[in-house]
Amino acid sequence: MIYAYDKVYLRIAQRSLGEMLSYAVYDLGYELEDYYKRFLQSEYSMRFSKGDLFVITGMSGAELAIRVLDIPDDDIIMPSYNTAKSQEYWTGWILAYYQWENGKTFEMIDKEIPICKIRNMYNPYHEMDISSAILKLREMSQVSSCLLYTSDAA
């Protein structure tokens, strides 16, 4: 498989997406689903999916959230950078890996597995090896694809 960007950038991408979701929820007060819709509608979602290194490595997760929401400079809230990793951080972290691995856009992934279902995987998957969570996401994607296919055929 050809990946959108080299694996050397993957950890940075995971951290960035995790920080973005955590900042949007805990510092800006957005509901995860509401913010994630804004991300999907922004140009940054597609640019991230395609491996745009400026989006992936050129800014922090908080900066990415600020750009997605187009927050004026005077209204920017400094990120709290909590050392404890939240469910939202883990959601972004695992989502970035899953997106990198399968090459789907975030929009395609969201149609198969809504962001709230990924967040709900936090317990017990954040304690497990990443491969367990990725395997579960693949299974969820296949079930969703089968359901979409059978509903279209009916």
Where are these regions (language model features)?
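Conserved small/polar residues in nucleotide/adenosyl-binding loops
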Residues: 149-154
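A charged, amphipathic interaction segment
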Residues: 83-143
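C-terminal alpha-helical interaction appendages
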Residues: 1-28, 34-88, 92-98
